[in-house]
Amino acid sequence: LSENLNAAFNVTEGEDYEIDYTFNTADIADSLAGIVTLRGFLNVAPVNTTSNFPGAPLTYTNQPKGHATVFGNYTLGDWSVDAQWHWFSGGTNIQVYGAGQTFYTQPYFGSFSTMDFTLTKQITFGDGTVMSAYFNVQNAFDSVPPYTVGSSGNPGSIFGGIPQGEDVMGRYFTIGVRGNL
């Protein structure tokens, strides 16, 4: 009698938090106009451990353990300004402890954050069609993510891996038009 058995395992633990708040600025002072929307996300994943087969050394992820994103929007009539702050915690490049361990000159990497801004103008045509023209600055402060091992973001880097979801392009601008067909 034989049976296929997947003896590998993966242990993960984590928590997610979200908070949203919207208010009219006239509620603060009658002379103010517009609407402010704030939104925040926090993810903490302290454990992500795998083993490929019984007796194999445990492998620990080298991804950051904490991530946070905060969105802010101010809308006044047909104009809006958006800001997004994205952060991840530092982490370790060491994925295996004990037999098979690799020792790195820089075993840990630091935390990292970026800031994006968007200015949008909503345009309404005579037939009721609505379009938006926007100007966006990604990574406004030209931050460079720390280099890690065993991972790669897109477009990647000639110097090694970077945490997933990050890029090494630096600051860039986008101008565009959005509309519904």
Please annotate each region the language model reported.
Residues 46, 87-96, 121-181:
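C-terminal beta-signal and adjacent terminal beta-strands/loops
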Residues 11-15, 64-68, 111-115, 129, ...:
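Residues that define the transmembrane beta-barrel architecture of outer-membrane proteins
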Residues 30-32, 100-102, 129-130:
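Short glycine/proline-enriched turns and hinge-like loops at secondary-structure junctions
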